[in-house]
C-alpha cells in the first residue's frame, strides 16, 4: 500500500475524551472514529488490525476442529423468555420492537439462539460432539462506556458453543478451548493468564477468564508470579487427545490466579510471599462449562444408544476481538506510539523514502516495494512529499514493527537502513538483504492477510 493513496487521518493532538493509552493512540493513529457513546467506525488502519486478529482466531479455531458459522445480530425475545433470561439480563440488553409489535433484541450473547438451532437439527448422540462458533458484532448497553474499544457498547466477538453427550466430554471441550486460546493469544504477542472467575449472567459451574496484565485493567487480579514464566510455544497438540489437553490445563491453572470476584485470601496466602502478586488485568476472553442449564430450559435433547432422551451438556467460549486491539496497545507501546507485535501488525513493514523525487531513491523504494509484495508481504510505502521527521513520527505512531529507510546517502554505499520499532536498533544492509531479513522474520510469525 502506498501511503499517498491510503486514508490515514492521523491527529497531532490527543483528544480530550481519551483516558487510556490505547484509546489515545487509536484515535491519533486514525484507526477509529467515535460515532456515538461507545460506538465506533473502524477506519482502514484499525480495520486491517481487526481483520488480522479475526484471522488468527479463525485459524486457531479451525485447527481445533471447530466449525465456523454466522448468526443474526437481532434475535426474537421469545427465545430469551423461554430460557428465563429476558427479564434477568437487565438494562444492558438493548430491547427493540419491530413494526408488527414483536419484541426483539440486539444480541448481547447467543446461547439461546445456538441452542434453538441445535434442537431443531440434532436428535441423536451419533451427531455429537459438536462445536460451532461465530465472529459477530454484539451490543451491550453499558451504563458508562469508556476507554474506547476496551469498554464500548458495540463490540466484535468470537463466541463458540460446544454440545456433548456427557459432562466428561464437555469438560474435554472446555480444556480444548483453553489450549486453543493460549495459542491464539501467544500468536498475537500477548500473555493472557487463565484465571478462575465468576460466571456472571451466562452462568456455569466452571469458568476461566483470560487476562492481560496492564495498569489500566478494570479487574484486580491475584496470582502466583510463576505463572508468568509459562509459555505455550511451538508445541504440537492433538486436540482429540484428552490427556494432552488436560495436561495443558493443569500446567496453566495449577498455580494460584484469580480475579477479585473469586479471590480466596487463605489460598493466596499459601503461595510463598515472594511470589504473591496483586495487579490489574484486562479481560480478553472467557470460557464456560454450564452443563445442562440451557439445554434443559430449551429442550435441546438427544437420543442415546439405549433410546433414552437426555439433555446435552454445553459450554460457551468467547474472545473479545475488538477489545484485543486495546489490550495489545496497552501491553505494547511507548511515548511515541503503538508497537505492534509481528502477528497482528497492519502492515509487515514501512518503507520511508527520505528524498521523494530523487530518481535513485524513488527507484530503490519501488524495487523494495515490489520485492516485498512479490513474496506475499504487505509493506506500507510512505511516498508522500513530506519532511523526513514527519514520516518517522507517523511510522512510530502507527507502530509497524520494522521500518526500511531509503536515502541518497545510503544508496551511494549500496545500503538501506532497517530499524526495529521495539528496540530502536538500526542496521545497514543491501536492499536485497533487507527483503530477506523481513521475510525471515515473518516466516516465524505467520499473519493472515489484511484488507
Curated annotation (Swiss-Prot):
Q: Chief location of this protein? A: cytoplasm
What keyword terms does UniProt attach to this protein?
Answer: Aminoacyl-tRNA synthetase, ATP-binding, Cytoplasm, Ligase, Nucleotide-binding, Protein biosynthesis
Catalyses which reaction(s): tRNA(Pro) + L-proline + ATP = L-prolyl-tRNA(Pro) + AMP + diphosphate
The EC code for this enzyme is 6.1.1.15
S-S pairs? none
Q: How does it assemble?
A: Homodimer.
Function (record text): Catalyzes the attachment of proline to tRNA(Pro) in a two-step reaction: proline is first activated by ATP to form Pro-AMP and then transferred to the acceptor end of tRNA(Pro).
UniProt protein name: Proline--tRNA ligase
Amino acid at each position: 500500500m502506498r501511503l499517498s493513496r491510503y486514508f490515514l487521518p492521523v491527529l497531532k493532538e490527543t483528544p480530550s475524551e481519551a483516558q487510556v493509552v490505547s484509546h489515545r493512540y487509536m484515535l491519533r493513529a486514525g484507526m477509529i472514529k467515535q460515532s456515538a457513546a461507545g460506538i465506533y467506525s473502524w477506519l482502514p488502519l484499525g480495520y486491517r488490525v481487526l481483520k488480522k486478529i479475526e484471522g488468527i482466531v479463525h485459524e486457531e479455531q479451525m485447527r481445533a476442529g471447530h466449525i465456523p458459522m454466522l448468526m443474526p445480530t437481532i434475535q426474537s425475545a421469545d427465545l430469551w423468555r423461554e430460557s428465563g433470561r429476558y427479564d434477568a439480563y437487565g438494562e444492558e440488553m438493548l430491547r427493540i420492537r419491530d413494526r408488527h409489535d414483536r419484541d426483539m433484541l440486539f444480541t448481547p450473547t447467543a446461547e439461546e439462539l445456538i441452542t434453538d438451532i441445535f434442537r431443531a437439527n440434532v436428535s441423536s448422540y451419533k451427531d455429537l460432539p459438536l462445536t460451532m462458533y461465530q465472529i459477530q458484532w454484539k451490543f451491550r448497553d453499558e451504563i458508562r462506556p469508556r476507554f474506547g474499544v476496551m469498554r464500548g457498547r458495540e463490540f466484535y466477538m468470537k463466541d463458540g458453543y460446544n454440545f456433548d453427550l456427557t459432562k466428561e466430554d464437555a469438560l474435554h471441550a472446555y480444556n480444548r478451548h483453553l489450549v486453543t486460546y493460549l495459542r491464539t493469544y501467544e500468536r498475537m504477542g500477548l500473555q493472557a493468564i487463565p484465571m478462575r472467575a465468576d460466571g456472571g449472567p451466562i452462568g456455569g459451574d466452571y469458568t476461566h477468564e483470560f487476562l492481560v496484565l496492564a495498569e489500566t485493567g478494570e479487574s484486580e487480579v491475584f496470582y502466583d508470579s510463576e505463572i508468568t514464566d509459562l509459555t505455550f510455544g511451538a508445541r504440537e497438540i492433538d486436540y482429540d487427545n484428552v490427556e494432552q489437553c488436560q495436561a495443558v490445563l493443569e500446567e496453566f491453572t495449577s498455580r494460584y490466579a484469580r480475579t477479585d470476584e473469586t479471590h480466596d485470601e487463605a489460598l493466596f496466602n499459601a503461595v510463598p510471599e515472594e511470589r504473591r502478586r496483586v495487579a490489574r488485568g484486562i479481560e480478553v476472553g472467557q470460557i464456560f462449562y454450564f452443563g445442562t442449564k440451557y439445554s434443559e430450559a430449551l429442550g435441546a435433547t438427544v437420543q442415546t444408544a439405549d433410546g433414552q432422551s437426555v439433555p446435552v451438556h454445553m459450554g460457551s467460549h468467547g474472545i473479545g476481538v475488538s477489545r484485543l486491539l486495546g489490550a495489545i496497545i496497552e501491553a505494547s507501546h511507548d511515548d511515541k506510539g503503538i508497537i505492534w507485535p509481528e502477528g497482528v501488525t497492519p502492515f509487515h513493514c514501512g518503507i520511508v523514502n527520505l528524498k521523494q523525487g530523487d530518481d535513485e531513491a524513488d527507484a530503490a523504494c519501488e524495487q523494495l516495494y515490489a520485492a516485498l509484495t512479490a513474496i506475499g508481504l504487505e509493506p506500507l510505502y510512505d511516498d508522500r512529499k513530506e519532511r523526513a521527521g514527519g514520516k518517522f513520527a507517523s511510522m512510530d505512531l502507527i507502530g509497524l514493527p520494522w521500518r526500511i529507510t531509503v536515502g541518497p546517502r545510503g544508496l551511494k554505499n549500496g545500503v538501506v537502513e532497517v530499524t526495529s520499532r521495539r528496540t530502536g536498533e538500526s542496521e545497514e544492509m543491501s536492499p536485497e538483504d533487507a527483503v530477506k531479513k523481513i521475510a525471515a522474520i515473518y516466516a516465524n510469525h505467520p499473519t493472515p492477510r489484511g484488507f
